[in-house]
Curated annotation (Swiss-Prot):
Subunit record text: Heterodimer of an alpha and a beta chain.
Species of the source: Neisseria gonorrhoeae
HAMAP family: IHF_alpha
Entries under CDD domains matching the protein: IHF_A
Protein name: Integration host factor subunit alpha
A UniProt-annotated Pfam family: Bac_DNA_binding
């Protein structure tokens, strides 16, 4: 199962009183926009009980074109990583 932003908005409408569907959609969109902009500015995000979003700089490295076998460089880049908190890991393990 995949949880979409629309489904998150529906959950907000169901669980929080006096929240309209449009307000819930806006809240969800603002939440993710804040995460995007914070990461884009180079800052890390720590959500207690959930996990950490961290930025990692990966250096250039050699790669290979799978079709031709030709060596090509994979450019340096910045990636986002997520590390789940112990609490989240425990909850996931409990439900498995």
């Amino acid at each position: 199962m995949t949880l979409t932003k629309a489904e998150l908005a529906d959950i907000l409408v169901d669980k929080v009183s006096n929240v309209t569907k449009n307000s819930a959609k806006e809240i969800v969109e603002l939440f993710f926009e804040e995460i995007r902009s914070t990461l884009a500015s180079g800052e890390e995000i720590k959500i207690s009980g959930f996990g950490n979003f961290q930025l990692r700089d990966k250096p250039q490295r050699p790669g290979r074109n799978p079709k031709t076998g030709e060596e090509v460089p994979i450019t340096a880049r910045r990636v986002v990583t997520f590390h789940a908190s112990q609490k989240l890991k425990g909850m996931v393990e409990h439900y498995y």
